[in-house]
Each structure stands twice: as C-alpha cells, then as structure tokens.
Amino acid sequence: MTCTIVVGGQWGDEGKGKIISYLCKKDNPSIIARGGVGPNAGHTVEVDGEKYGIRMVPTGFPNVNAKLAVGAGVLTDPEVLLKEIQMLEKFNVGERMIIDFRCGIIEEIHKELDKSNEHLSKEIGSTGTGCGPANVDRAMRTLKQGKDVESISKYLGDVSEAVNEALEAGYNVLIEGTQGSLLSLFYGSYPYVTSKDTNAASFAADVGVGPTKIDEVVAVFKSYPTRVGEGPFPTEMSVEEAESLGVVEYGTVTGRRRRVGYFDHELAKKVCRLNGATQIAITCLDKYDNECYGITEYEKLSEKGKAFIKEVEEKVGVKVTLISTGPELTQTIDVRNK
C-alpha cells in the first residue's frame, strides 16, 4: 500500500498531468483522487497522440481500472464535469467517477462575479471560473454542496471513506494536486495567488486523508518555469529570449500566453520543504536540451541534461526520480527503484 501526492512546484503548468498519467499507468492505483481548488486549473493529457484538456476529471483517467474521485475540498462546476464525462466516454469515466457529496458547487453567479470583479480579473489575473466567489460563499456557509444538485446525483459518494478503505485494504492511492505551491493563498506571492492553499497537506485534507497515511510526495518542476497572469517572477526572461529558445506556451484554461523564466533552485528548495517532498519530477527536459527528446534511460541523456538534473539534486536536496523527455507517457525516465 502506498499513498502518493503529486504537487506542482512552481506556478502551475509544470506538466503534472503527464507525470500523474505515468504514475497511474505504472503504479496502477486503485483510486485516483483529485484535490485542489476547482475547475480554475487545467491539465492536458495526451493519449495515443490525442490531447485532452480537462479541468474537473482526474488526469489519471486513462487507467481504466481505477476509480476516479473528486474530494470534498474541491469546488465542482457541474456543467464542466458533465461535459468532460461525456468527452471521455470511451474511457468509461462515468462508471468510475465518485464526487464527494460535500463538495462545494460553482454556479453561474459565481462565474459572473469572478469575471466582473476588476480587482480579480485585471489586477490578480483570475481565470474567471468562479472559484474565488464560490469559496467566499463557502466561508459564509451559504454555498450549495454536491448533495443539493440533482444533475450529478448519480456520481455522489463519500470520497474520504472510499480512499481510506482502499488504503486499509492494501491498495495504492494517488492524490492529484492542482496549480502550484507558489500560487498558494497562504504561501504564494499574495495577493497574486489562488483562493486557497495549494500544497500537499491541503490536498490530503481535500480528499479526507490524514497526514500519517501519506507515503510519498512528488513535487513536479518544469525545466523552465512559467506563470500565467500577474505577480512576481524572479527569474523571468524576456519574450524575445523565450521565443529564441522556442518556448511559447498558452494556458489550458485561459488561453493566455505564459510568462517564461529560468529554473530557480532557491524557490524549489523552499517548495520541497513546504510540501515535505520525498521525490522530484522534472518535466520538459527536452525543451532545456532537445538532445534529450524521447530518451528513456538516464545514462543516455546528454551531458547538459545530466548536469541540469545533478544541479537540481545538489541545490534542492531532494532526489530527482522521474524525468519527462517528451509528451508521450513512454517518453519518461523512471529511476525510483534505482
């Protein structure tokens, strides 16, 4: 039995979707449970060359043997959820989905408030998905819960009970975090943050798992960090620099161009300490050095690629166990058992 949490180490968009999908295939968890804020964070999953952009369904959905869960701490937009279940019909997502009956519900009024609030939309760079206003209502105890919405009633259940029973029975469980540690309401660059905490301890609480049940925390870092929206970015490079390196990205949810920077070892060290990270996953190493593209054995990485990994381990103090060298799941180096 192993309970693993995957957390973003930067400002989101680190490639958690790829790492989560890989772990779900390799480790075959019984339940894949989603923590985090809500549908404000998007993940892109590539399966057999086809890309899926999702915001509610756990990104481990390609593992058709696992139950998929959305924890009580996660805000749920029924409209988004039902569209994704339909889109992923060939993966039998609807038959495997458990939405906690206590989850908070985003309604149209929350999205309207989010988009019309000038402070949130222009100064902070909110995604406009209604999460902030919904969390306000939750704090005021006026927010609807999953059990109050008929359209999702067939998917409702007790996620905490399901996850804990799976762990007690000796099964693997994977908890998906969303966004990144540096967007945490508590520990990020306030006020340019999201509407709740985005660290491992909170993700465990979101799905109803106690801290002593967590075995592994995988912090995911991209070889070059990116950020959507406003806020400090200590190692940010110019648009011209990013384009010269061939690094041009757009957000999954907002479609806004991502700001790009250089890897920040000091911030990475703080993030790993904050999350109690036991492992690091590095994504997009092939963007740092295209000679690393598609490599699946550590020994075959370029010297430049190896030097990057070594520097991360030495300066951050946590072992790099997973390295992504391309978008496909097979383009992954896994040294966890070496």
Curated annotation (Swiss-Prot):
GO cellular component: cytoplasm
Gene3D superfamilies the UniProt entry points to: Adenylosuccinate Synthetase, subunit A, domain 1, Adenylosuccinate Synthetase, subunit A, domain 2, Adenylosuccinate Synthetase, subunit A, domain 3
Residues the entry annotates as binding IMP: 13-16, 40-43, 127, 141, 179, 194, 256
Residues that, per the record, bind GTP: 12-18, 42-44, 258, 284-286, 324-326
EC numbers, comma separated: 6.3.4.4
Protein name, UniProt field: Adenylosuccinate synthetase
InterPro entries linked to this entry: Adenylosuccin_syn_GTP-bd, Adenylosuccinate_synth_dom1, Adenylosuccinate_synth_dom2, Adenylosuccinate_synth_dom3, Adenylosuccinate_synthetase, P-loop_NTPase
Binding-site list for substrate: 252-258
Active-site residues, record numbering mapped to chain: 13, 43
Enzymatic class: ligase
Catalytic activity: IMP + L-aspartate + GTP = N(6)-(1,2-dicarboxyethyl)-AMP + GDP + phosphate + 2 H(+)
One GO MF term: GTP binding
Family: Belongs to the adenylosuccinate synthetase family.
Job description of the protein: Plays an important role in the de novo pathway of purine nucleotide biosynthesis. Catalyzes the first committed step in the biosynthesis of AMP from IMP.
Annotated gene: purA
The species this protein was found in: Methanococcus maripaludis (strain C7 / ATCC BAA-1331)
